[in-house]
Structures are given as structure tokens and as C-alpha cells.
A protein has these predicted regions:
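N-terminal subdomain of lithium-sensitive/metallo-dependent phosphomonoesterases centered on the IMPase/IPPase/PAP
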Residues: 1-92, 153, 157, 273, ...
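Oxyanion/phosphate-interacting regions
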Residues: 2-7, 13, 203-221, 225-321
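Short acidic loop-to-helix transition motifs that present clustered carboxylates
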Residues: 68-70, 175, 194-201
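Short acidic, glycine/serine/threonine-rich loops at helix termini
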Residues: 73-75, 103-106, 124-127, 178-184, ...
Length: 321
């Protein structure tokens, strides 16, 4: 009598997804420092899509390069994979997070994939969200409605630190002037970063990283990608819609989102017990090192996380031409 076969999971395709982000990173890295953000992004998109379509699975983009009429590749609703095999996945991608960092040779650029079972990843309309993210030790103490100082004090207590030792990472934007002032008034440190709140949110989960909290307003797509990783690491992210203008409000209304006060947690953005997150560095940042080329060998550094099994792997790959 044959034993029942286990249902396929993301872990069975982990290395396949790593290969996707690796090739996208290598393609984008050729444009580092050349001032061509759009060409760097296109190189990553082309490489990512091409490799996805060699994998035996059935995937659908739920977060990608925009609507079908805005993008010809990796658009929302696009089907990926060969269609063979029993694995059906929601896919969220950022083929090149921090395109400007690549164009200008600044740190912290990644190629990113998050996956989950069909219907598991939040279909986030392209807008902005207010966010607060922390690692596992402080996952139950944050409150997006609480004053900044209260959240800092609670996180400090959860981490066994003095408030003066807490570092809050904030995207370096004019809209965050008051937030920066509030963090400093509370007695904590501020670490500003130019781009890349996915990697920065994840950094809160590693005790050897100086970042303790991510706060501020950033992209909704990045919130879903970060949530997938934080689910794997038992961290937490709290988000609330913060559309910047009437155009963004209309976009959300068209997507069926009318209550901007709803608080969304990691579990709301990346549901289920089979979530995965894969990223490869293009330019070195807080999560992984970037692409390096020595003679004829290209080296990539990637991170792979999953909730089933709950694990994190750092992968260094040397690609021999």
C-alpha cells in the first residue's frame, strides 16, 4: 500500500527561487554606479521573469511591477512557471529594491521574492503605509496608536536595554521630520537610511544588528514583502494605510479599500503556514552582501527563510563562467 504523499511546499522549491533572485541580482549589478536606474530595474525584471518560467510550479503575481497596462513583465495577475507540478503560489516580487541605490552606487539593494499558498499574500494597492516593525522579543509590545516614546520604552524593556541604547531606523524623507524629533526627544538614537525598508525591517530581528525598531511611512508593497520575512522570523510589523493624496485614495477605493484606519499585522499581510522569503544582495546592506566579481567568478549572497519548516539560511554562491 502506498503511503500518502506530502503536499508540496515552498521549501521544495527553495533553491529554485534562490536561483531566480541570484540571476536578477547579477543582471542588476552590471549597472551599479552608472546612473541608469530604469535600465538596472529592467535587467533585474527580465532575468527574474525568464528564470521563474523555467520552474515547475504555477505562480501568480500579486505584488509586482504594476498593473498589466503599466508593465509588460511581472505585472499583477501574470502567471509564472511551467504550469507543471502541484504547487500553486501567490508571488510578491521586487526585482530590484532600491533602484536609485544601484544607479548611484549606494548601499542596500536587493532582489526579493515572497511566496505563499494561493490567497495568502495581501493584495496591496500601490500606495503608502505607516509602519512599525520589531523583532521577536518585542513583537507583542508595540502599538501603532501609542506615542513614539511609549513604544520606545516598551521595546527597550522587552530587549533588556536602556532607552538611550535603542536605535530607531527611519527612512530619510522630509515627511519624517516630526518622527525623528520625537524619537530623539524620547532619548533614543535615530539611524536614517535612504532606501530599502524591507531589509531594514528584517534587520530588527537580529540581535547583533544595531537596528531595534523601524518606524515611519513607506511603500505598501514593501510592507507585504517585509511581513513575509517577519512571519518566518517571528517578528512583527504593524501597518496602516497612509495615502499621500487624492490619487492614492482613489487607487485604494478602486481596490476595495475604504477604511484607512484598519491596522494590519504581519499575519494579515502574509497569511498561512507556508510562507517563504528569498533575497539576494545587489549592493551590500544590513541583510546580505552584494554581488562581487573577481576575475571570471561572480559571487552572490542570499538569504532564504520559511515558516514550514521555520528556518533561515544564508547562501553564498560562486558562479563560474
Amino acid at each position: 500500500m502506498k503511503s500518502a504523499q506530502a503536499a508540496p511546499s515552498s521549501s521544495s522549491l527553495a533553491l529554485e527561487f534562490v536561483r531566480v533572485t541570484e540571476l536578477a541580482a547579477i543582471a542588476a549589478a552590471k549597472w551599479i554606479g552608472k546612473g541608469e536606474a530604469k535600465l538596472a530595474d529592467k535587467a533585474a525584471v527580465d532575468a527574474m521573469r525568464k528564470q521563474f518560467n523555467t520552474i515547475d510550479f504555477r505562480g501568480e503575481i500579486v505584488i509586482g511591477e504594476g498593473a498589466k497596462d503599466e508593465s509588460h513583465e511581472l505585472y499583477i495577475g501574470e502567471k509564472l512557471g511551467t504550469g507543471k507540478g502541484g504547487l500553486v503560489r501567490d508571488i510578491a516580487v521586487d526585482p530590484l529594491e532600491c533602484t536609485d541605490s544601484v544607479a548611484n552606487g549606494r548601499p542596500n539593494a536587493l532582489t526579493v521574492i515572497a511566496t505563499g499558498p494561493e490567497g495568502s499574500l495581501y493584495h496591496a494597492a500601490d500606495s503608502y503605509m505607516e509602519k512599525i516593525a520589531v523583532g521577536r522579543a518585542a513583537s507583542e509590545v508595540i502599538d501603532i496608536d501609542a506615542p513614539v516614546a511609549d513604544n520606545i520604552r516598551k521595546v527597550a524593556k522587552a530587549l533588556g536595554k536602556d532607552v538611550s541604547e535603542i536605535t530607531v531606523a527611519i527612512l530619510d524623507r522630509e515627511r519624517h521630520e516630526k518622527l525623528i524629533a520625537d524619537v530623539r526627544a524620547a532619548g533614543a538614537r535615530v539611524q536614517l537610511f535612504s532606501d530599502g525598508d524591507v531589509a531594514t525591517a528584517i534587520a530588527t530581528c537580529f540581535r547583533d544588528d544595531p537596528i531595534d525598531i523601524l518606524m515611519g511611512i513607506g511603500g505598501s508593497s514593501e510592507a507585504v514583502l517585509a511581513a513575509a520575512a517577519l512571519r518566518c522570523l517571528r517578528g512583527e510589523i504593524l501597518c496602516r494605510w497612509k495615502p499621500k493624496d487624492d490619487k492614492h485614495k482613489k487607487r485604494l477605493h478602486d481596490a476595495g479599500i475604504t477604511d484607512f484606519s484598519t491596522i494590519l499585522r504581519a499575519q494579515d499581510l502574509a497569511r498561512g503556514d507556508d510562507v517563504s522569503f528569498t533575497a539576494t544582495g545587489v549592493v551590500t546592506g544590513p541583510l546580505v552582501e552584494g554581488v562581487t566579481v573577481i576575475h571570471e567568478a561572480v559571487t552572490t549572497h542570499s538569504v532564504v527563510m520559511s515558516t514550514a519548516p521555520r528556518a533561515i539560511r544564508f547562501i553564498k554562491t560562486r558562479h563560474i563562467n
